[in-house]
C-alpha cells in the first residue's frame, strides 16, 4: 500500500484541521490535470500515473499569502519525510507534471508546501545486521572452548605421561628388588661364583689327594672336611662327577638334586635343669633352611612328616653319626665338667654339664679355611655329611599311641616296606598257646625280655627294628634309644594318624583287651605329645611309680606296671 497522502484542510478560524488520505479524492489514472482542493480555489493538485502503477501526488500552493496556518501544518506533517529522504536526491520528494520541476529547478513554493511524495528507496533505521555480531560471538566462544579443550588435553596427556613414568619406575624398582632377593637366595643356598683368588697358591689335585691319604691314615675327620679333595674322592663313583687332574670346578655349575633324606641338626644331651644348647653340627646348613636351628627343632607333630597315613618324626641327625666301638660301652662318658677332650674323630668338645653319662656339649671345628672359602667349605661339609648319613640305612622306629589307636596296623604297613624288618612288643610276652593271659607281677620281666630281643636284632644289623608299645612318656623309650644310638641307628617316632586316637570313647570300643574309658583317659592325661631324641635321653624314670601310677583293677593291670606297662597295648584292627 502506498504511503498515505495527507491533506491539510483549513476550515476557518477557530476550526480544527482534519487529515484525510488523498487517494480517496484522486481521479482515474487516465485524467491528467489539476483538481481543486477543499481548502480553496487557488490550490490545485497535479496527478500523474507513472509507469510503475504508483500515483505520485504533489500539492502546490500558488498563493503563499493564503492559509499560513495550512503551510505550517503541511510542513509539520512532512518533517519526518524530509529528514529521511532529502529533496535533492532521486529517491526524495519529486513533483511530477509541474513545469517548475520539469526544468530541474526546485520551486521555492514546493519546499515548504510539499505535502507528500513517494520513493523507491527503503525508509527505515540504519543499523548493522545482527548476524555478523552473532557469528563473531560464536567464533570467539568456539575459540575459547577450543583453547580450554586443548589445555585440558595437554594436562591429561601430561598426567598420563607422569603416571606412565611412575608405573615404569615402580616396575623397574620391583624388578630390582626381585633380582636382589634372588641374589640373596642364591647367596644363601650356595656360592654361584668362583671364590676370589687369594694370595696363597692354588691347591693342586695331586697335593690334595696326597693330603687326603695322610688324613685318612690318621682318621682325622675335621681335616678331611677342610680338604677339597674329599669332595673329588667321594664323587669318583658318581657318573656326573669325573675326577681328573684339574682344579676343582666351580660349584655353581653343578646341581645336586639327588641328595637323599633330609639331614636335620639336633640338640645334644642336656640334664633336665639346664636349658638346651644351640647345637650347630658341622656348621653348615641345607639349602633353604636356617643356619642355626631353633631350640624347638624337635617337636612331636610339628616336625613330623606324613608317611603311609601317619605322622613320622624323622630324626636323621647327629646321633646317627656316632660311631662307638662295640666293645666300648660309653667308656668316654666318665668325665668332669669344663674338660675339653677330643671326641667324634677329632672334634673339640667342651663338656658343660654331665648327668648319667650324657653331657651338654658344644662342638667347634678348627677350620682356618672357613674364613676364606666359607661357602665352598660349607657345601663340601654338607655333602660329606649327607653321604655319611646315606650309608647309615639302619633304622629304629618307636611307635606311640593309646590302646586302640591303630599302632599294630601301622607296624604291619611299615614292616611290609622292608624285607629285613622286625616288630617287637612287650605285649607278646603274655601271649600263650591257649590265649592271652596278663599278669602284673610279670610286667618287669616282660619289659626286659622285649628289650633283649630288640638289642639282639640291632646287634645283628636288622632294619628297621619296630617297637610296638604305647610309649606315652619319654623315659619308657630311653633303653631302646640308647642301644640304637650306640650302634649308629637312626631313630624315628611314629604315631598313627587316626581321627579317634585321642578320643577315649572311641578307643574303648576299638581296643581288643578291654581297656576302660577311664583308664584310657588317665593315660591320655600323662601323654607327652612333643617327643625327640634329646627329650628321651634327658628323661628320668620316676622313683615313686606306685604313687604316680596306681595299680589298675582286675583286667586293667597290664597298664599299671613299674616300667611303664601302659606301653604294652598295641592292638588295633584298622584305622
From Swiss-Prot:
Coiled-coil residues: 162-194
InterPro entries (alphabetical): NEDD4-bd_p2, P-loop_NTPase
Keyword Cell cycle: no
Compositionally biased region (Polar residues): 564-575
GO biological process, one term: in utero embryonic development
GO CC field: nucleus; transcription repressor complex
PANTHER family: NEDD4-BINDING PROTEIN 2-LIKE 1, NEDD4-BINDING PROTEIN 2-LIKE 2
UniProt-recorded name of the protein: NEDD4-binding protein 2-like 2
Species for this entry: Mus musculus
